[in-house]
Amino acid sequence: FSGGSDEYYFKPGLVWTDLSTGKISFRILPPGAIACSAGPMLYISDEAKRLYLEGYLNSIVADRYVKLLCVTLHFQWGDIAKFPVIYNKDNENNVSLLVEDNNVLSKEDWDSFETSWDFTRHPFIKAITKYPNMMDVGNIYLAECYDIWAGECEERFEKLKDNEEELNRIFIDIYGLQDELTPEVEDKDVTVRRADLGRDVRSFISYAVGCMFGRYSPTYDGLAYAGGTWDDSKYNIYKPDADGIIPICDDEYFEDDLSLIHISE
């Protein structure tokens, strides 16, 4: 593997943050990016080896070398290159499968909120589409959607934690550190989020405001409108505000007042 050379521009690799007061984390970066000093990258041409290295570098074994070799707040390329790598062919497939699963779980979590470029719809809305029988009872309550989302978050959290502990166990055995390290992962070190009522309801309000102004549509994945040509076919269930202004008044002055349209007594 190599890093920094222009021959590796736009190729997939492993990226990490150079400066941090917390634990280092290595992530897969898809094709199309260029490394920089603030976000160095490792480029590995073989996908299986890339996944294997991602599993190793995020394990408790590599964390031991981080503490030994990275003695400042910087995680520099030269220090990472000094990490001893034992490539165990017998465990290659198992490690790759676990790491691939972790990548999927982590991306599912990240894509659940508007900060992701691949955000589609709010998870509360997705809960309705996943369980269409909810529509049969007529009213759909926010509490039910949140409960479904909370269950999915907990399942994802526990699965990722189990996978990380299994990867720790594999690399502890490979490096013969059974007497030095244990595979357990603390909850605070699991990077996917558990459900949080306050945070998740606020994110839903943000999404709802986006729907009111046409940025999103409950039946359309991703951005429904971000400039350009307006496509009314994307809003077949919920129509956004016509003039892009939603008044909120004490009395009923306007027919499109927020309290009249969206808040039932």
Spans of features found by a protein language model:
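Non-catalytic DNA-recognition/assembly elements of restriction-modification systems
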Residues: 84-260, 264
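Basic, amphipathic alpha-helical recognition segments used for DNA target recognition
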Residues: 7-10, 17-82, 96-101, 105
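Unusually extended, aromatic-enriched hydrophobic runs near protein termini
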Residues: 1, 5, 13, 22, ...
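Hydrophobic alpha-helical scaffolding
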Residues: 2-6, 14, 28, 32, ...
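Flexible, glycine/threonine-enriched loop-and-boundary segments that flank and lead into catalytic domains
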Residues: 1-31, 174-176, 183-199
